Amino acid sequence: MAEIRNYTLNFGPQHPAAHGVLRLVLELDGEVVQRADPHIGLLHRGTEKLAESKTFIQSLPYMDRLDYVSMMCNEHAYCLAIEKMMGIEVPERAQYIRVMFAEITRILNHLLWIGAHALDIGAMTMFLYAFREREDLMDCYEAVSGARMHAAYFRPGGVYRDLPDSMPQYTVSKIKNAKELARLNEGRKGSMLDFIEDFTKRFPTYVDEYETLLTDNRIWKQRTVGIGVVTPERALNLGMTGPMLRGSGIAWDLRKTQPYDVYDKMDFDVPVGVGGDCYDRYLVRVEEMRQSNRIIQQCVAWLRANPGPVITDNHKVAPPSREGMKSNMEDLIHHFKLFTEGMHVPEGEAYAAVEHPKGEFGIYLVSDGANKPYRLKIRAPGYAHLAALDEMATGHMIADVVAIIGTQDIVFGEIDR
């Protein structure tokens, strides 16, 4: 009888479930995975090196392009690192706006995750549902920064501008009749805070719809329960963070354990799993969407009652107002210096981490006192999770690899960076 041997299969980088440019070399015994070898680097753009030749403000838009699904959370960590080194005091209103948009970003990320994860496993409807809600939140991004994805809205010392008084409205087109237009524009008649408040009232019903589709669906359970189990000890040893760690039963959330901005004033719960499998991580992320909604509601209520500055008045860090520049020579000089030479960050080093939708996203910044970083190190949460893929997939069927990649919520912008 011929010798039985394993065969090797390339999964990706063109595979639709590979979430970008993942190349997995799978060693199979029949349909059972014996070893999974992830190959990374296909989306490497040298972000850390590029930052060394750019001023601190010029590097900010690179952050959006790391995890291009959780744009403002990346910016948040970068701004916190600079603020830590320079000892900048951020106005309270700016902190509330940041927290609100960080949670909007978390919902955006989890919506794409639940849509794509369900689509990979075979539940197509979920994908369409998720994109319906993402559209509203993308409009918030666009209203506040002018861009739907790469916003570059956060700034060292605050945010780029205050929240607008109006929302963009849909106009007449061939595919939308008057009745449809009236429905779409119903919540857009007031300010941006009105629109966000309207969304937060509608959103829990939408999450209930997702749970109706998936939570007790027996096919969904068959594809996720007991798949990719990670024990609490292994989750810690493998460097997992975020929903991957909380899904294994460890209540570690930087927003609670090491609060930044105004998270210490927020009332929310940290969902924790029990079994550490794909199903538990799904439940954790769904509950996170509900908790993010709660935080956004608290931010909206505070922002309504407390007007004020949204960026520091230190013009060595933040540009002066347009009006000031037109009438005051000193403001004009500050503006010119800031956007040509940039700000000089004191010599030293700092690490700032945020509770990113995927885990702990950290920025380690080293400065030699110049106007550019001496070294910028990015701690991407997905990097540690992908390293655990071999351990999570071994012994499972090849079809379950897709579910495990989905549950890790991998985006290659941050892994290859």
UniProtKB/Swiss-Prot annotation:
InterPro entries: NADH_Q_OxRdtase_suD, NADH_UbQ_OxRdtase_49kDa_CS, NDH1_su_D/H, NiFe-Hase_large. It catalyses: a quinone + NADH + 5 H(+)(in) = a quinol + NAD(+) + 4 H(+)(out). PROSITE patterns: COMPLEX1_49K. One of its GO terms (molecular function) is NAD binding. The keyword Cytoplasm does not apply. It is found in: Cell inner membrane. It is a peripheral membrane protein. It is an enzyme of class 7 (translocase). NDH-1 shuttles electrons from NADH, via FMN and iron-sulfur (Fe-S) centers, to quinones in the respiratory chain. The immediate electron acceptor for the enzyme in this species is believed to be ubiquinone. Couples the redox reaction to proton translocation (for every two electrons transferred, four hydrogen ions are translocated across the cytoplasmic membrane), and thus conserves the redox energy in a proton gradient. Belongs to the complex I 49 kDa subunit family. This is NADH-quinone oxidoreductase subunit D. It comes from Chromobacterium violaceum (strain ATCC 12472 / DSM 30191 / JCM 1249 / CCUG 213 / NBRC 12614 / NCIMB 9131 / NCTC 9757 / MK). The lineage of its organism: Bacteria, Pseudomonadati, Pseudomonadota, Betaproteobacteria, Neisseriales. The gene is nuoD.
